[in-house]
Amino acid sequence: VLALCLAPWLVALPDAVAAQGTAADPRLGSGPAPAFGLEQMRRADPLDMRQSLPVTQPDRRPQAVRGTGGEATAPMSAIDWLDALTQAGIARPGAGGAAPFDDSGDIAESALAPEVRTLTLSASDAGAVGLLPASVTGLPTSLWEGAETAALIRRIERLEVDRLPAMQSLLYTLLLAEADPPDASGPQTEDDPLLLARIDKLADLGALDPAMALIERAGQTRSPALFARWFDLSLLSGLESQPCRRIATDPDIAPSQAARIFCMARNSDWDTAALLLETAGALGTLEPSEERLLTRFLHVDLDDGAVPLPPPTEVTPLLFRLSEAIGEPLPTSDLPRAYAYYDLRGRAGWKAALEAAERLARTGALPENRLLGLYSGGRPSASGGIWDRVAALQAFDAAIGAPRPDRALVRETLPPAWEAMQDARLETSFAALYAGRLATYAAEGDAAGRIALRTLLLAPDPTDHLDAISPRTPTEAFLLALARGRPDQVEAPSERARIVARGFSAETELPPRLARLIDDGLLGEAILEAMQLYSFAMEGNVGDTAPAIAAFRALGLEETARAAALQILLLDDRG
C-alpha cells in the first residue's frame, strides 16, 4: 500500500510536471535550458511521525503467544497518501465529488476469506522499485541505462551533500526514482547492488522512512541483505516488532544469532531466548559485547547493583537498542546520522531531540514542520547554545504567527531568529517555513527587509514572491535576475557573482568527462558527476563553479541550476 510506504518528509506531487523551458542548444545560452521535467519538488506539510514505545526487558509472566491476528503494527509513516493528493490539488481517477452509495456490485456469498494470489518480483523489477514515478520526477526509467553498476555505486557512496540543500533535493529524487537497473537484461541475482546502495545512502542521510519504504516495495524477505537492512532500520525506528515476528516464524532469516535471541525475547518467548543464549555462549558464536548485553537484557535479576557495561567497540543498531533497553543508552552524537533518528522520540530529553532534529534537517531528512514542532515543544530551561536558538525562533514564530501580526514586532524578532538559524546552518529550512509570510517585508529597507529578501531567494520557489520587489542595491538586482535565470541582464557586483553568471553563459564549456557522459546518454551518471563538481565548488574550488551550473542546465535541470547558483552566493559564509 503506497500510503504505508511514503515518509512524512516526502515531497508532495507538484500541480503538474512542468517543463523547464526550451532552447536551441541545451548547453548554450542564458535562457532556460531544455528539461526532462524535473522540478525542485515541494515538500508537503507533514504529520508527526509515529512515536514508538521503547524496547523493554521481557516480562517473565506467562503470556499468550501473539499470532498474526494480534495487535496490528502501526504504519511506518503517518502521512495519508490520499489526503496528500487532495492537498496537492490532484483528484483520484473518477473522483467527481461524493458518489451515491451503490450496492449493486458484487456481494459476498461466503464468510470464507477469498483466495489471495501473489506474484514474486523478478530481480530486475525489484531493482527498479522507487517511491517517485517518472510522471513525478520527469526522469526516464532508463535513468541508469548504460552505466556500470560499480561506478554508480562508488559515485553515490562518495557524494557528500551535507549542507548543500539543492544537491540534497536532487539526490533524494535520484535515490527514490523508479528506474530500471543499469543492466536489466543481464544475469539477475536476488540482490540488486544499486538498490542496496540507494537504501544505504538514504540511511546515511538519516532518511530512514523512505529507506524502509524501498525495502518493503522490493520485498523485505527477498534476500538476506534486504532483510538485514530492514531489521537494522526497524530497530532505529522503534518498529522492530514486524521483523521480529518474521524471525519467529522463520528463524533461518535472522541476520545473526544475536538478532534471533533478541527477537525471541521481544516476542516474549523467554525459554527459547534463554536456551539460545546459553547454547551460543557455550559455542562461542556471539561477540563478547553481544553476549554481555543479551545476558543483561534477559536476566532482569542482574540489574540491581550491576556494574555498568563498557560501551561496545563497534556499535550496531542491535547493540544500540540493547544498551538503551538495559538503562545504559549510548549518545548518538558520535554515531552515524541514522542513529539520531532514535532521539526524535525524546527518550533522551528535549535537548537531545533538538540536536538530533537539527542534525537530520541539515541533510533534508527531517521535514521543516517537524523541526519547528520540536523547537516549539517547551520552554528553554537554560541559556546559551541551542537554548538561545530555541528562544529566538519561538519569539519570531509567535510574532509572525499571530492572527494580525505586529509588523514592528516581526521586524524586531526576525534578525535574532535568522542569526540563530545561520548558526545552526539551517537557513533553507527557515526559508521553507517562513518565506511566504515574509514576502511583504522584503521591500523594506531595514535589516529585517534584507533578511526577508534573502529568505525569499532561498525558498523552494523564489519566483513566486519576487515580482513586486524592486532591488535597492546592485547585489539585490543581480540576485533577483539570477533567481529568474537571467543573470546576464544586470552587471555582476563581485568576482564571485561573475563566476556564477558564467554558468549561464553560452561560452562556458563543460569538462570533457562530463560532456562525454552526456553525449553517451548516461543521464544518471552525468547528474551524479555534475553534483560532485558542485560539491567541489562549494568546498572552495572556484574553477568548478561555472561548469557545475552549466552542467545542470545542459541536463535540463534549470531549477536546480538556479537554486545551486543562489546558494553559492547566499550561503558562502559557511566556510
Q: Which role fits each region the language model picked out?
A:
Residues 19-575:
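Alpha-helical solenoid repeat scaffolds
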Residues 2-12:
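Bacterial N-terminal signal peptides
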Residues 13-19:
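Sec/Tat signal peptide C-region and signal peptidase I cleavage site
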